[in-house]
Amino acid sequence: KWKGVCESNFTNKCNNKLIGARSYQLGNGSPIDDDGHGTHTASTAAGAFVNGANVYGNANGTAAGVAPFAHIAIYKVCSLDGGCSDSDTLAAIDAAIDDGVDILSLSLGASPIPFYEDSIALGAYSATERGIFVSCATGNSGPIIASAGNAAPWILTVGASTLDRKIVATVKLGNREEFEGESAYRPKIPNSTFFTLFDASENATDVFETPYCAPGSLTDPAIKGKIVLCLSGGGVPNVDKGQTVKDAGGVGMIIINSPRYGVTKSADAHVLPAVDVSAADGTKILAYTNSTTNPVATITFQGTIIGDKN
């Protein structure tokens, strides 16, 4: 049944798990994943069992995708800057149909548009007509009000969800307030020392980069020995923010999430003590920082907690 191939420049990467690899990515010519998104979503769909999977010893257990024994064929349609052309998307879906896939999983999309203008909806319709099951992501954001993308009735539309596992870190302020966040950082030796807080937004030299702790943007020597408050986003991955803080002499970091992500927090493998907090809690931390001449805080790490329904 399977008629697909691995492109000639990728044949040594294919095996009994990864049986197909093609690139339609704006003429790039290589199926290799440029930023990790494709690898991540492929492992979610069909990753094999991996015993002892963990991040710095956190969340230790057996990792697996939804269909761990399934074969995978990869069709790369997006560029590193996030561009995914309609022509590439349709060409990849057509190729997958011809190759004989059983299921199409697409973790990409945009704001809703009429079905007759939507390349994913059109391609998915053709696949469904040929007996192929099509599953598409509809985004990760919330709790803002919006219309779901990839909502054609012939598509299984899948939204982001949560689980009852957290990798908990707690911010303790000098006024004794505490705020729960998340972080995959795991200190070798617990440290409950209080350090002075430094707000990157209030001390910005570049309003488009400094608040987000973009690489090279933290030039104030006063950062040395302090915990830096950084805003999430700005096109800067969370771990890169931490590296920027570390390079500037900071000893820790608190990332304040965007309001559009609600209570969602990210547990990242940071390079220094760091924690991700919600926008609501971040607002309270900022209020404390601005209310005193010597705002201080410490970050403690509780590790993996199972069974948390919040």
PLM regions: where:
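Loop-rich non-cytosolic ectodomains and luminal regions
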Residues: 1-310
